[in-house]
Each structure stands twice: as C-alpha cells, then as structure tokens.
UniProtKB/Swiss-Prot annotation:
Role summary: Part of the ABC transporter complex FbpABC (TC 3.A.1.10.1) involved in Fe(3+) ions import. Probably responsible for the translocation of the substrate across the membrane.
Example GO biological process: iron ion transport
Record keywords: Cell inner membrane, Cell membrane, Ion transport, Iron, Iron transport, Membrane, Repeat, Transmembrane, Transmembrane helix, Transport
Organism: Serratia marcescens
Protein name: Fe(3+)-transport system permease protein SfuB
Length: 527
C-alpha cells in the first residue's frame, strides 16, 4: 500500500510541474492589451475630433450637399457592385466545382488571378485603353472585375465540401434542378456570400486610386483631395467620420444578414464524393462564355495594356533611375512591416487559441474593427496625432509602419491563430514531461507546427504593404517612393509608358498571394 502511495505521489509531482492550462504570462497579456488599445486609435480619434469640434460645426460640415452627393455615390457604388459580384462569383464557382466544364481546374485558378492585379492598376489599364471611361458606370465595371474573386473563393470552397446527398434527397422528393439550387444549395452559400460581400464593400469604401483615376468622387477621394489641397483638418475629419459610420454600418448589416444560422452535416456515415453534373456539348460551349469573358476582361486587358506600353517604351523604361530604388524601398518596407506585424500578432493569437476567454475575444475584435476602416482614416488619424503630440515622428518610417500595423494586423492574426491551433497544448505538455525545458518544448512542438501559419500570415502582410497606396501617399517620409507611389506619380502625369514597369512588378509580386489564397481555399475544403 505504501509503495502504491509513493508511486502516486511521484506521479502527481511529476505532472504537477506541467499544468494543463497555466495562466498566460503577464508580458503576453500586457502586450495584447496595449496593441488592442492602439488598434482603437483611429476610431477614438474620429470620436474625439467630433466632440472637440462641437455639434454646430459638425452639423455645418456634415449636413451639406457635397456630403449628400458623396454618400449617394458610395451607396450606388456598393448597391450596384455587390449583386453583380455575387452573381458572377457564385455562377463561376458552380461551373468550376459542380459541373464538367472543360478545363475547370484551369478556370478555377484564373478566377482567382484578378486579385494579383491591384485595383488601381486595373483602372490604369482600362483608362489607358478607353480614355472616356469615367463616372459611376466605369467605377462599377472596374470594381466588379477587380473584386469578384472575393465571393468566388469562399463560394467555391463551400461547394467543394457540400454533401451532394442533400441535393439528392431534394431531387428524390420531386424538386427540379433549379429549385434544388435555390432552396438547398444557395442557402448554404449565404455565409460565404455575406462574408465576401462585406469584404468587397469595405474595399469599395477604402479604395482611392481606382476611383481617382476615373474621376469618380467617393468619400476617400474627397478626403484625400481636401487634405492635399487645403490641409483643412475639420472638413477632412468630418468626412472621415461619415466614412467610419458607413464602415460600421456595413459590419452591422452583414452581421444581421448572416444571422445565427449555421450549417452542419449530422447523422452516421461520411459525406460521399461529389459527381460533377455533366454538361452537353452545346451547354458546355455556352457555359464557357462566362469564364472566358471574365478572364479576358479582368486579366487579358491589363496584361495586353501593359505589354503595349512596355513595347512602346522599349528597354528605356527599365532604365528609369527611380524604378529600382522604388523596388528596394518597397521590399524593405514590406519586409520590415511583415516582421513587425507578425511579431505583434503573436501575443493576441496565442491568447485567442490557448485562453479563449471573453476578455481576449473582445481584445481580438478591436483589431478586426480597425482593419475594416479605410487606410485614409488611419492615415489621417496618425497625421493629426503626430503633428500635435509626437512631432518628431511625423512623416517618418515609424509612423508609416504603425499605420501598416493598424491596417494589416488581422491578416497575420488569422493565419497565426490557425497555425497555433495546429499545435495543441497537450503536445507541449508531453514534451515537457519528457524532460524538455519550457523553451525547448515550445520550440520543438508549437513553433514548428505553427510555422506554416506564421509564414502565410507574414506573406499576406508583405504583399498587402507592397501594394498599399493611400496611407503611404500621406505618411511616407519626403523622398520615399515605393512601387505604388511611383506608379501613381507617373500616371498622374499621364506618363503611362513609364508607369508600366511599376505596374508589372507589382503584379509579379502579387502572384504568390493569388496562389496562396487559392491553396488556402482548397485546404479549407479539405482537399
């Protein structure tokens, strides 16, 4: 009996040094809290400026015809663009995932590829081809070509993992194929379409270069013009406040439309593999028109336009003295930003996965709310704050990197969460019970398993910074020129030939992002 007690005591002591759910370290918690409070800086700035300005001034600046015009433009842009993107994205997802469309795997990759072309490069391609493209119609057309993959990707992922048995049951009960699609399949695409639509809508509100190039006024272009022309703080800040309200309204609307509905397969057995719906030759030829048309418009026109300008410019365009320094500046800023943001995201991701308490979920949510705000709002907040309170860092790389941190933290956070979730705490505990130190256990289990998620998050941040235009224009130090700002300066001078190499390099840098997003969507579907 005593031997058994002694053995039990030794076992208890051995495992007591490896608690299953230890408390998070103070440094981790404090870091997460400080970063989350920092993330609320732009939102707090807008609210603070509104209170400081006073109701009478706010009313005079907000309730005027110009703001009504901008609001109408924004609403029309969103209301017209989203349904078209939804129809095209879902239709293309259905054709590539659930039918025998010829070359459907190739079309699936090409449907993602427009994300490699920055929206302002897409606009540059079309405006240089059709100089008369201006206004709302042009804005909707180019926005659809630039952003429809944001609905295609999640819709395709859902269709890949959807159990076809559900559709078979509906068919056996007498429903015809169109009724099966609208009553069975489409409701299960609701979450994907709502999420993709929200992402597109936020891009529409935040985009500057696309709409400035086609001379279509939105809140972002108006704020930038106000800031550049008169440095009128109150007017620009009030426009930013209205823009923030629009973004928060979109978040609320998406949450309401999404509802609490969730879809899951229940019952015994596993979902059977899908059998693509066979298309007859005439129907297949007709169905091919959609991916061919979208590929030609979203990819063919930009690449043909770039090839044309590069051909006209010859080798001289590559000898531009500012091109290669701009590439180096872009790579260095992107690398520094990716490293900084990934390191800053680790504490929050760690707490979110290992200690999913309500407080930590709220802290994590602060970062997502801020990332929904347009870059122009973040930049305007940092410009005003640094001028008034931290003048030494105004228009320095510190402020620029801080803006990137506020804007792109969720891109690293989401991937870090997924990576850390691949390394359950039990594996770390087992390693420590086998004699490894906490640091060795962390390195040999958690960090190794989380490495792909860390790398994916850093890559997404790197590529986002490489193509960022609006905040960089406002915050970059004097003399700093990235590929995006260099491209913008040349297109503003109507020097489309000299701008072509900048655009081509940005597209080349974005191609890995396209492949990464496509691969992630396949992994999400379990393929």
């Amino acid at each position: 009996m005593s031997n058994l007690s002694t053995h039990a005591a030794q076992t208890a002591r051995r495992y007591s040094v490896v608690p299953r759910h230890p408390r998070p370290g103070a440094i981790v918690v404090v870091s997460a809290v400080l970063l989350s409070l920092l993330a609320l800086l732009p939102l707090g700035f807008v609210i603070g400026v509104a209170f400081e300005t006073g109701w009478q001034t706010v009313k005079a600046l907000v309730f005027r015809p110009r703001v009504a015009e901008l609001l109408l433009n924004t609403l029309l842009l969103v209301v017209l663009t989203l349904p078209i993107c939804a129809v095209l994205g879902v239709a293309l997802a259905w054709l590539t995932e659930r039918t025998t469309l010829p070359g459907r795997r190739l079309w699936a990759v090409l449907a993602t590829a427009p994300l490699a072309v920055p929206a302002f490069v897409q606009s540059y391609a079309w405006i240089s081809l059709v100089p008369s493209m201006h206004g709302l119609g042009a804005g909707v057309f180019i926005s659809v070509l630039a952003y429809f993959p944001f609905i295609y990707l999640p819709a395709a992922a859902v269709l890949r993992r959807l159990d076809p048995g559900i559709e078979d049951v509906a068919t056996s009960l007498g429903s015809r194929p169109p009724a099966v699609f609208f009553r069975v399949v489409l409701p299960q695409l609701k979450l994907a379409v709502c999420g993709g639509s929200l992402l597109i809508a936020l891009h529409l509100l935040a985009e500057y270069g696309l709409y400035a190039m086609i001379r279509f006024d939105t809140f972002t272009t108006a704020i930038f013009d106000q800031f550049q022309s008169t440095f009128n703080g109150p007017a620009a800040n009030m426009l930013a406040g209205v823009l923030v309200l629009c973004c928060l309204g979109l978040l609320l609307l998406e949450a309401i439309s999404r509802g609490r509905a969730r879809y899951a397969r229940v019952g015994s057995g596993s979902a059977r593999s899908q059998t693509p719906r066979r298309l007859s030759p005439p129907l297949a030829a007709l169905a091919l028109l959609l991916p061919i048309a979208l590929t030609a418009l979203a990819l063919g026109v930009p690449f043909i336009t770039l090839a044309r300008w590069l051909w006209l410019g010859g080798f001289e365009v590559w000898r531009n003295a500012e091109l290669w320094p701009a590439l180096w500046q872009t790579l260095s800023l992107s690398a520094a930003g990716a490293l900084l943001i990934t390191l800053c995201a680790i504490p929050m991701a760690w707490l979110s996965v290992r200690y999913p308490a309500r407080l930590y979920r709220v802290l994590e949510g602060c970062n997502y709310v801020t990332s929904s705000l347009p870059g122009i709002v973040v930049a305007l907040a940092l410009v005003t704050i640094t001028i008034h309170s931290f003048r030494p860092i105004y228009q320095t790389e510190i402020t620029l990197l801080l803006a990137y941190l506020l804007m792109f933290m969720p891109r690293a956070l989401i991937n870090l969460r997924a990576g850390i979730a691949q390394a359950p705490v039990e594996l770390e505990n087992v390693a420590r019970s086998l004699g490894k130190s906490p640091a060795q256990a962390l390195w040999s289990t958690t960090l190794r398993l989380a490495a792909p998620g860390v790398a994916a998050g850093a890559a997404l941040v790197f590529l986002a910074i490489a193509n960022e235009l609006t905040a960089t224009l406002l915050l970059a130090p004097n003399g700093t020129r990235t590929l995006a700002t260099g491209f913008w300066a040349l297109t503003s001078e109507i020097d489309y030939v000299a701008a072509a190499p900048y655009a081509l390099i940005m597209v080349a840098l974005s191609l890995p992002l396209t492949w990464l997003l496509y691969s992630q969507s396949k992994r999400t579907a379990g393929l």
